[in-house]
């Protein structure tokens, strides 16, 4: 109801604006509304099948000043990091809440790592605690994912800090590609599912900032500063394509076109945002190819909305590819 009321107000205001600004205002409203549609499936019990060897670890993060909960399924020395969406919860990772990912990667020869928390974080190192929502520490997710957690897992779970895959959806799609851009030994494989792949361009900083504010009251200026700050480009996969090409990172990029199929997701925000996101994904593919990139899989099917069933379908589809690249298993089951 709150979302519908916001939309009515914004559609009324938009009539007074120029066309480009009208599109941005409506897009921002839908983006903020979609945060609830996609990620706000708060339930107390995660999806893991009973009997799977899923552990709940508390990994120290000196940079953030507290332990971070990790859902972990051991399966090999190489691992798949499954990153969450904008409304990441503090109890379980969204991949476990909304998909059978642990089951799908059981006996794959790969360990599965699901960090818990990080709402609106973009899994990035922020400048300061979020201003306006009372956050008492500074997000340092990049430090945690690339230094603190890998060291702990190597010492305690025999998971190597090199030769892993980062898989992200929506918010974390860009995060996965950025992690691979700057840490190629740790992440020779990165997958973005319906990710925002050019966040520093045009109206994206504004839309991202408003969506973050809607999802926990987080302040994008506390993350990367104003849109003119170099941190926005530093964390922009489109800008960092030369790094991905030079690293020869294996990338998997997926985005639907907003048309639902039998998997569902037939609601206005999910359809609109996926169609809005598709254009930056297509530009990313063209720019990647023009930059000499030859190690990517790009899936842009004639269907798919911004919702979990489509992302899970891609996670299953990429499993043999991940196994081959990471050499984590000869079993493609």
From Swiss-Prot:
Annotated segments matching region Fibronectin-binding: 102-112
Record-listed E.C. numbers: 2.3.1.122, 2.3.1.20
Gene: fbpC
Residues in the signal sequence: 1-44
Function summary: The antigen 85 proteins (FbpA, FbpB, FbpC) are responsible for the high affinity of mycobacteria to fibronectin, a large adhesive glycoprotein, which facilitates the attachment of M.tuberculosis to murine alveolar macrophages (AMs). They also help to maintain the integrity of the cell wall by catalyzing the transfer of mycolic acids to cell wall arabinogalactan and through the synthesis of alpha,alpha-trehalose dimycolate (TDM, cord factor).
One MF annotation (Gene Ontology) recorded for this entry: trehalose O-mycolyltransferase activity
Record keyword Lipoprotein present: no
Chief location: secreted
Family: Belongs to the mycobacterial A85 antigen family.
Residues binding substrate: 86-87, 170, 198, 276-279, 306-308
Domain of life, per lineage: Bacteria
Subunit details: Homodimer.
GO CC terms of this entry: extracellular region
Annotated coiled-coil segments of the chain: none
Cell compartment(s), UniProt: Secreted
Catalytic reactions on record: an acyl-CoA + a 1,2-diacyl-sn-glycerol = a triacyl-sn-glycerol + CoA; 2 alpha,alpha'-trehalose 6-mycolate = alpha,alpha'-trehalose 6,6'-bismycolate + alpha,alpha-trehalose
Broad enzyme group: transferase
Protein name: Diacylglycerol acyltransferase/mycolyltransferase Ag85C
Active-site residues from the entry: 170 (nucleophile), 274, 306
Keywords, alphabetical: Acyltransferase, Secreted, Signal, Transferase
């Amino acid at each position: 109801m709150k979302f519908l009321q916001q939309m009515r107000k914004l559609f009324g205001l938009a009539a007074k604006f120029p066309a480009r600004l009208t599109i941005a205002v409506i897009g921002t409203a839908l983006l903020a509304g979609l945060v609830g549609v996609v990620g706000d499936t708060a339930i107390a019990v995660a999806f893991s099948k009973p009997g799977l060897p899923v552990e709940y670890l508390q990994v120290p993060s000196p940079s953030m000043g507290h332990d971070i909960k990790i859902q972990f399924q051991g399966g090999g020395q190489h691992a798949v990091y499954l990153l969450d969406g904008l409304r990441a919860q503090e109890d379980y990772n969204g991949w476990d809440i909304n998909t059978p990912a642990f089951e799908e990667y059981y006996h794959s020869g790969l360990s599965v790592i699901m960090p818990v928390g990080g709402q609106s974080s973009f899994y990035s190192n922020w400048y300061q605690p979020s201003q306006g929502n009372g956050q008492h520490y500074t997000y340092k997710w990049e430090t945690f994912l690339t230094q603190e957690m890998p060291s702990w897992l190597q010492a305690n779970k025999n998971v190597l800090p090199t030769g892993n895959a980062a898989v992200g959806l929506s918010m974390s799609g860009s995060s996965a590609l950025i992690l691979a851009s700057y840490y190629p030994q740790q992440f020779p494989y990165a997958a973005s599912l319906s990710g925002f792949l050019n966040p520093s361009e045009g109206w994206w900083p504004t839309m991202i900032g408003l969506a973050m504010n809607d999802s926990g009251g987080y302040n994008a200026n506390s993350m990367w500063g104003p849109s003119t700050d170099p941190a926005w480009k530093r964390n922009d996969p489109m800008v960092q394509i030369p790094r991905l090409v030079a690293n020869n990172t294996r990338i998997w990029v997926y985005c639907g076109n907003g048309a639902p199929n039998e998997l569902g997701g037939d609601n206005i925000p999910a359809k609109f945002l996926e169609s809005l996101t598709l254009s930056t994904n297509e530009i990313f593919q063209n720019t990647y190819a023009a930059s000499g990139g030859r190690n990517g899989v790009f899936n842009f099917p004639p269907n798919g909305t911004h919702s979990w069933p489509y992302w899970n379908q891609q996670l299953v589809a990429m499993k043999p590819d991940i196994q081959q690249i990471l050499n984590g298993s000869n079993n493609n089951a």
